[in-house]
């Protein structure tokens, strides 16, 4: 069984994760344009949940397409 996760960069599509990567993650942080563009959002697959840096928000999940882009409706 291989998991489907959404991946950035755009266009954001659900892609099959490589064997051994059984988590989808969403990582968000602010860059220099945060006030005008909002947070930078990175989506992808992982074998283990990425460690969170102090300025990041990281969430992980383990079901197909469970990491849609926060600003997009799951399609």
UniProtKB/Swiss-Prot annotation:
Assembly mode: Monomer in solution, homodimer in crystal state.
Sequence similarity: Belongs to the three-finger toxin family. Long-chain subfamily. Type II alpha-neurotoxin sub-subfamily.
Keywords linked to the UniProt accession: Acetylcholine receptor inhibiting toxin, Disulfide bond, Ion channel impairing toxin, Neurotoxin, Postsynaptic neurotoxin, Secreted, Signal, Toxin
Record's function text: Binds to muscular and neuronal nicotinic acetylcholine receptor (nAChR) and inhibits acetylcholine from binding to the receptor, thereby impairing neuromuscular and neuronal transmission. Reversibly blocks chick and mouse muscle nicotinic acetylcholine receptors. Blocks muscle type nAChR with an IC(50)=30 nM, when heterologously expressed in oocytes. Also binds with high affinity to alpha-7/CHRNA7 nAChRs. In addition, shows a weak inhibition of neuronal alpha-3-beta-2/CHRNA3-CHRNB2 nAChR (IC(50)=2.9 uM).
Single Gene Ontology MF annotation: ion channel regulator activity
Organism: Bungarus candidus
Keyword Secreted recorded: yes
Signal peptide: 1-2
Any matching Pfam family: Toxin_cobra-type
S-S bridge residues: 5-24, 17-45, 30-34, 49-60, 61-66
Name of protein: Alpha-elapitoxin-Bc2a
Matching InterPro entries: Snake_3FTx, Snake_toxin-like_sf, Snake_toxin_con_site, Toxin_cobra-type
């Amino acid at each position: 069984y291989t998991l489907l996760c959404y991946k950035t960069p755009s266009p954001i599509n659900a892609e099959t994760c490589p064997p051994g990567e059984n988590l989808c993650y969403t990582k968000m942080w602010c860059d220099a344009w945060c006030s005008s563009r909002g947070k930078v959002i990175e989506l992808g697959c992982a074998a283990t949940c990425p460690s969170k840096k102090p300025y990041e928000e990281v969430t992980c999940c383990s079901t197909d397409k469970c990491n849609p882009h926060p600003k997009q409706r799951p399609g």
